[in-house]
């Protein structure tokens, strides 16, 4: 964890907003830069379709390994990340599968697959990330058990685990992980050794981490020595 409460983070964001160091957005903050526009500190302001174009090859490799873990009759959680969306697009062909997600684009893409039942989490709709945030659906999440939670993150480190820029989305993912038998992190090599605002899972919460073959040998050895079960896609 970052060692500070959500209240402290919100207070600091308010103060920086007043000082014109950034612009507050729902669940996060944006960097004030007249030359480049108002982009959030970790890129969260990018629209979903823009994020989907980044590291496409790596995401496809990761999703190709993740799909091997999915079986009929499972109930799985997929977050609103573009990597989870790539995984979701590989679910055609399943005849009996339940998918819980906070990703609007993913839900719309899966709704016409006959063998897939889609459940959207309750919450507030965000425009840029095309996701649903918040815990209005907390009671629902407490009642549903998932076999695997597939999650991505803005950053991943040994000290802070999986981190996200949105406090609200981190809260939702934290709840989903608690109700899942297994957590599988889908993290491309660019996310390693970086940290965003809100931690939602420690390294001990992760049963398997799938990354791409762009991860350096040194970084791979460091994380494996720390007990992380790494699956390198594309090796």
Task: Please report, for each region that a protein language model flagged, where it lies by residue.
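Short glycine/serine/threonine-rich phosphate/pyrophosphate-binding segments
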Residues: 84-87, 194-195
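HTH-adjacent hinge/linker in prokaryotic transcriptional regulators
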Residues: 1-3, 7-8, 13-77, 89, ...
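Conserved phosphate- and dinucleotide-binding cores of soluble alpha/beta proteins
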Residues: 3-5, 18, 24, 107-235
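Short, flexible active-site-adjacent loop segments at beta-strand->alpha-helix junctions, enriched
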Residues: 35, 82, 103, 124, ...
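A residue-level structural signature of the nucleotidyltransferase/glycosyltransferase Rossmann-like core
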Residues: 98-99, 148
């Amino acid at each position: 964890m970052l060692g500070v409460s959500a209240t402290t983070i919100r207070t600091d964001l308010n103060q920086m907003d007043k000082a014109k160091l950034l612009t507050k957005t729902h669940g996060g903050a944006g960097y004030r830069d007249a030359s480049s526009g108002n982009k959030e500190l970790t890129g969260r302001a990018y629209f979903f379709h823009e994020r989907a174009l980044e590291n496409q090859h790596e995401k496809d490799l990761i999703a190709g390994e993740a799909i091997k873990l999915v079986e009929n009759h499972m109930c799985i959680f997929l977050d609103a990340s573009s990597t989870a969306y790539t995984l979701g697009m590989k679910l055609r062909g399943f005849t009996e599968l339940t998918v819980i997600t906070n990703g609007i684009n993913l839900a719309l893409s899966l709704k016409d697959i006959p063998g897939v039942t889609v459940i959207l989490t309750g919450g507030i709709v965000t425009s840029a990330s095309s996701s649903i945030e918040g815990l209005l659906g907390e009671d629902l999440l407490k009642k549903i058990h998932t076999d695997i939670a597939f999650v991505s993150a803005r950053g991943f480190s040994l000290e802070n685990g999986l981190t996200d820029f949105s406090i609200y989305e981190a809260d939702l993912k934290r709840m989903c992980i608690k109700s899942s038998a297994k957590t599988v992190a889908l993290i491309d090599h660019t996310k390693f050794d970086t940290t965003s605002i809100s931690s939602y899972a420690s390294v001990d919460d992760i049963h398997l981490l799938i990354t791409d073959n762009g991860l350096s040998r040194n970084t791979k050895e460091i994380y494996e020595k720390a007990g992380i079960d790494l699956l390198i896609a594309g090796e």
